[in-house]
Amino acid sequence: MVKKNDVVSVVTTVGEFIGKYVESSESCITLNDPRMIVHDQTGMGFAKGLCMTGTEEPELGHFYNGQVVFMDKTNERVEKAYREFTSGIVL
């Protein structure tokens, strides 16, 4: 069971996102401090927001269920990297 502030991964039809779970409803999943997952030849990383041209460091992100494939608790290694990226504190 996912609890408030658990770090979760949301897979949508357009990409994968990570953030702290706030709530879900019939229409959407809401994350706090959400980030888009990005990939390049060196590996995986985090964008500063939800899209390449969007607001940096958004407070909330709403993912509408029509585009969500699934949500899962993020694995420990990626959660640690996300927390370091969003807080600036190396754990």
Language-model features: where?
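Conserved RNA-binding domains used in RNP assembly and mRNA/RNA metabolism
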Residues: M1-L91
